[in-house]
Amino acid sequence: MYRSKLDKLADHDCTQCELHEYAMNVCLMGRGEPQSRIMIIGEAPGENEDETGKVFSGRAGQILNRKLADAGLDPERVYVTNVVKCRPPGNRAPERSEWSACAGYLDAEVRAIQPSHVLLLGNTALQRVCRTSGITSPTKRGVQLSPRDPVFSSSFVMATIHPAYVLRNPGQDTVFSEDIRRFARATRGELQAVAVKKRYVATISGFKALVKQLRALPDKAVVSYDVENRYRPWNTDWSIQCLGVSWDGETAYVVPLYHPDSPFKKRWRELLRHMKSALERKDLILVAQNGKHDNVQLAGAGIFLEHKFDIMLAAHLLDENRPKNLGYLSQAYLGADQYKGGLDLKPERILKEPIKALCAYNAEDVGYTWQLRPKLKEELEAAPRLLRLFAKLQMPGSHVIQQVEMKGMYVHQDRLFDRLSELQGFIQKRTDLMRSYMPKSWRQEFNFNSVPQVSRWLYTSEKKGGLGLEPVLFTKTGNASTNEDAVLEYMDHPAVLMLLQYRTLQQKWMNTYLVPWSVGLDRNSRIHTTYKLYGAVTGRLSGDLQQIPRDAFIRSIIGAPEGWSFVNADYSQVELRIAAHIANERVMKRAYTLGQDLHMLQAMNMTGKAEKDIGKEERKKAKPVNFGFLYGMYPKKFQNYAAKNYQVHFSMAECELARQKYFEMFPDLTAWHNRMKRVVNERQYVVSPLGRVRHLPDVLSRDRTVQMEAERQAINSPVQGTASDIMLFAMIQLQKELDPREAAMVMTLHDGIGFEVRDDRVDYYEPLIKDVMENLPLKKTFGLDLSVPLIADVEHGQYWHGIDDAAGLGITGYS
């Protein structure tokens, strides 16, 4: 009955758009079981469907059927249809006018079936039902959406990529499978968040009752917490707007704090002090989403917490490619609605939002944080090595990084403002010189930060006032590129070299460091950086300092206050050492076992000279060779890499020869590269020696460039991830040895850690730091028995890198 009713909806003589002129079968309606009340909507029939007269009967349909079956849905018991009912010529995407013409047919199908659950396949279906696009965005696919078309108002709606997209991009197969499984769970009622009851604590008696309840919780009680805040504690305008807690995931208690409409706006610090003993209980299992942030906030109010489970860190460890924000995770794992409610949480706006709306948002945060823990914990427990990494590295590492952020780095203000003035003068001279290379009529209004103006200057003919350069790279819109890679091609031109210098000095040195530092100092002359343990897919820490110049001109502004020394400890060539271990490269391993310098050996290999005859510049030139070719970089990319990162310039012939000599010197690296490429093509992921997983689905791409990048990532990710994990593990071990009255970690950058040590304790801590870093319990903790030694170089002085008198160094390399 239902089937014949649906068949009658089709009008095979339809002429509402031009598609009927090209289609073999006009007005193809859906197939499957309408009584299941599960509906899947694609875009339009393809060539095979047009020939057979049956939707989703081609290769895309085969993929869909297989994925549905894998997820526990019988493909014959769902109803599958399309937005557009006739095949567009050439299998192009349907146009808006075409799916508007077919709107009545799809609406009729929906009314006849009354689907409880709808899955949209591809951008056309997403646009048709939800009036939005961006199907590959994690905020649009695999999560519950709000339909804008009223005919779908009573349906659960989810979207994912079209199976035809998976055919073109095999690396998306995993994403597609996960979305189908999530949709299947939703149809079975397994994707349902527990509604969070919100308790707004607006009276002193209510607050006292809350504190009493927290204190009465049993041992091992799971408590989630979250704050909404503006700025950080060392900012003069810092404040916490509300604090929420939950111990069952169903009810969240939120205390309004500093806000114009808060009943406690004048007593918010006092209230937090009263919560201190209740929250600092060591027997509680504290859970947070990006808890390092919340802990820093609460520490500003005198509450010092160490949470046991971080939702964001767990999610990142399980899948580094997906979003880690709570909105996405609560939708993906719990089926929760998007709940931010249009709130603007930026520091300058948050106090203008209604306090009850902020508290309601905060309540959802703590409720869903609590509910997510068992889901992520279960996944971690199914992967023991990841669970160990989470428990032994990520969580304790988060607490150590939290303390580093709170301590901050000491800034010598006299140096900061002297350097700022010197740099401003130097940049002005550079811009004046660059203007001499252009017509007078351009000079006064010329903006070196304007892409169109710089493009005009670079690529206009000399007769018309430009430099007359030929563009070598183009943007997606077809315009000549002015980015660094494009401009590097002409760095022999004096004006281009000055432009590159200007960009480095103005945009990086000045705008990224000196100016923000000058306005961001706290009352103790410290700047506080932020580090993310989830910021890089390889597992590397990411933070504000990652791109800081190596020059002493900038770095020697950082140091230690009077009576203290700045101690810098760097791992020597740690990535090369890790690579030697993973690749089992015998020449490299032997060199490190004998205590040899690999950069010196490489310089000798490149020049044919004895060690005693190698100069400083020759060793410097060996560094990019060792690091660039380690992961299989090709000559052209290496040439730019060496120039950009090391200010070392190779001709193309030198690049090719250096690459050849490199792999002749280290023959086992080639076998390692081939092995990792084979592994990633078989599994679509690789695993580091410590157990960190790097998912690389793009290795299945039909685009060879994309595939090659995934293969390169398969080689370098385990090395970079392990090096970063070892650095974080060293920080954890070192923190146990530091007496805060005598020494403190104040920063980390790449392979190094910075400390402030009291002058009279430097002789004690320097050898201690070196010993801890070189003798980490990696085997005992992670089962990793490194086949090469770790070496740490430790030095101290009043300023960063042991520079005792950096005054008058000048802006090196830019004369």
Annotate each language-model stretch with its function.
Residues 1-190:
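A polyanion-binding, active-site-adjacent surface
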Residues 39, 147, 153-165, 331-357, ...:
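A short, charged helix-loop
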Residues 399-406, 475, 522-524, 528-529, ...:
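Conserved catalytic core of nucleic-acid polymerases
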